[in-house]
């Protein structure tokens, strides 16, 4: 990789360091088939973008509970959705951060596929090999089918995560996506099995770290190669091997980038400890107000 190009990337203020390494450099170096960036959350100032959108739609959202007639309610929801999507176009897709991500994707010879998760949350998948697109698009299409099925006939027994992300409980889908994203086979299989059994993967991974620390074991951060990745166990040899290989290649590219990645790996382990708390905070926004008042 051209040193001047790398220096420019590292100085880019509109792309977060984690995105530079995990989402751009790893696919560019052929170390990951596909990477994923959630926007605007993984943009510098992403939270502020979301707040600006929310502020614009808040007056309309506040009126929704007062609309009781079914046809009027449906129309009000559609208007709200349109407002959210227009807000995303203006504040996210019109931002320097968005333009910088796509500019760097092009400059590094990478390709991308953008997928809407919610009106104000999109995922950008980044890859080098053109042949990957077919598998990726097929997976995203299957995800849409699973979500439409759940939304068309909601099951009152489903929890918040099952309703919002039904694909997370479809083992075959998880395994296909996990392999595309470069996760070790053993960790993908454990994740899929846990989800199918109703095990809270985030809590399981956090508890594994806590129990290891209680038992006097030293935590091996090298088992956590990526953010929001949950290894099958805290000392997983396969995920540790991934970190060792990736860090070696990044150090060969530039010692500073290798050191940056080392810091990220340590932060990944800490984020696993916090993940159950973060998910609960996210899901709480979907709770009916009367449930919140009881807590």
Task: Enumerate the language-model features and the residues they cover.
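A conserved ligand/cofactor-binding region detector
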Residues: 1-165, 176, 183-295
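An amphipathic, hydrophobic-aromatic interaction surface with interspersed Lys/Arg
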Residues: 171-178
